[in-house]
């Protein structure tokens, strides 16, 4: 039922970073919102990352960000086209291959996972865009580099969209902004000022607004895409989400990776679906698992169960002659809670620490060093003044067929999927009379999903928290109050 789509993703690396700089900055400045995703070299202790205390959890993520690095950054710029029917967006997606110039830890699990999903470490070490972590050094902030690109992102003052994004935000801060503050309250205070238009977490939106059966990235994206396609095919009232991409010609073709989003095919009969992957989008057996990891089949299976239970409830209510209450099967917790009670202990890899009872009952999936519990990626756009790409609602034609990598896991395409989920959720909650400054999804504004917690992390400055000195100085530079870049030692 879902429609096919080919997403052009622009691969950005050291040999074309300056050439594509103007295009990236224009895409950022003209967007309605920006979705971001990262690939990391590791995360460290999984037990510490799921600590009951949020302050302890933050310290563990900080330690990971200071000792590990961002290997790849993806961002998708969604620009709403006001002259088009419904909710139509021009989407431009970029996938940046990065190389930290400082020593960092890279975990074997991360390498294995990324290689399985097509990450090219040879290309990273040969052509990765260099960056350093912590505070600014000298005049580097004024050049064409990652820190300057992050400044452009802040200056654009656009809503930022992430998926399960607390870890992403901590790594972005340490790698491209400044040294991380020691306390969570200070970090949150800084974050609230860095992104005044708000931060939205589609993991939170999927769990508590859309209330899907599962909330890992690929599942949420394909479910949104399927529901949107059904609504269009049904011809009912209401707005729908449509996407347009740029057409690329000439030398730009060599930079683009076309990522296919194919139709899901209905399959009858018993589906041998991996229960672990179905619940979390992650399986310890990886590609060696004998059960199906096909997200389309998983969604089809969930839809069938939902429909069967709806019919059963209808027959039961008809028999009783009364309208029964909606049952718990519509809750997104059911699949996970049932699975956790019966399968999780057996499915955890030997190399991972055993989950606590608090973690078992959490509505979250196991965490891999590189966000292995989420899947997808994409990129796009040319910024040459001489030959601006022409916008088109048609899927771009690929110059040659490329063999798809295992899965769709790349930072750029993950960012695209994150943005699509947000566009779909926004479309469901959109107020036609809202002002340009109103929150895009008020119920999800500045709420970061917390694994194992029933409440999100609110990105709002507390009256008891002060901003860090490095952040205050950096904000002066971002908004033009200061042209000097403070030495590295600023705390």
Q: What does each model-found stretch correspond to?
A:
Residues 1-491:
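DEDD superfamily 3′-5′ metal-dependent exonuclease/proofreading module
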């Amino acid at each position: 039922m879902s429609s096919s789509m080919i997403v052009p993703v622009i691969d950005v690396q050291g040999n074309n970073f300056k050439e594509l700089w103007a295009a990236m900055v224009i895409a950022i400045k003209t967007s309605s919102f920006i979705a971001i995703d990262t690939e990391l070299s590791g995360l460290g202790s999984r037990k510490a990352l799921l600590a009951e205390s949020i302050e302890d959890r933050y310290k563990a993520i900080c330690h990971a960000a200071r000792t590990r690095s961002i290997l790849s950054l993806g961002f998708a710029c969604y620009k709403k086209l006001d002259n088009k029917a419904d909710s139509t967006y021009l989407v431009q997606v970029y996938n940046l291959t990065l190389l930290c110039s400082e020593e960092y830890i890279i975990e074997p699990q991360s390498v294995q996972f990324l290689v399985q999903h097509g990450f090219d470490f040879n290309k990273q070490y040969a052509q990765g865009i260099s960056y350093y972590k912590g505070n600014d050094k000298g005049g580097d902030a004024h050049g064409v580099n990652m820190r300057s690109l992050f400044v452009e992102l802040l200056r654009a003052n656009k809503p930022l969209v992430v998926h399960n994004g607390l870890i992403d935000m901590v790594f972005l801060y340490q790698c491209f902004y400044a040294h991380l503050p020691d306390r969570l309250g200070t970090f949150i205070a800084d974050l609230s000022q860095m992104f005044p238009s708000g931060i939205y977490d589609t993991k939170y939106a999927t769990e508590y607004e859309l209330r899907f059966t599962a909330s890992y990235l690929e599942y949420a994206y394909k479910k949104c895409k399927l529901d949107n396609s059904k609504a269009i095919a049904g011809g009912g009232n209401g707005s729908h989400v449509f996407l347009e991409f740029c057409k690329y010609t000439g030398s730009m073709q060599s930079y683009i990776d076309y990522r296919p989003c194919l139709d899901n095919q209905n399959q009858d009969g018993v589906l041998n679906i991996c229960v672990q992957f179905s619940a979390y989008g992650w399986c310890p057996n990886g590609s060696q698992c004998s059960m199906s990891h096909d997200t389309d089949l998983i969604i089809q299976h969930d839809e069938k169960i939902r429909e069967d239970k709806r019919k059963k409830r209808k027959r039961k209510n008809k028999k009783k002659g009364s309208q029964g209450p909606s049952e718990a099967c519509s809750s997104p917790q059911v699949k996970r809670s049932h699975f956790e009670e019966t399968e999780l202990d057996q499915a955890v890899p030997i190399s991972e620490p055993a989950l606590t009872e608090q973690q078992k009952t959490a509505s979250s999936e196991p965490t891999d060093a590189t966000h292995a519990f989420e899947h997808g990626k994409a990129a796009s756009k040319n910024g040459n003044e001489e030959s601006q790409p022409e916008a088109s609602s048609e899927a771009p034609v690929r110059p040659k067929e490329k063999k798809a990598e295992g899965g769709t896991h790349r930072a750029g395409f993950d960012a695209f999927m994150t943005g699509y989920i947000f566009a779909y959720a926004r479309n469901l909650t959109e107020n036609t009379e809202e002002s340009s400054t109103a929150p895009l999804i008020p119920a999800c504004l500045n709420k970061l999903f917390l694994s194992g917690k029933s409440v999100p992390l609110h990105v709002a400055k507390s009256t008891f928290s002060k901003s860090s000195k490095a952040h205050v100085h950096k904000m002066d530079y971002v908004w033009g109050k200061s042209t000097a870049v403070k030495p590295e030692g600023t705390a």
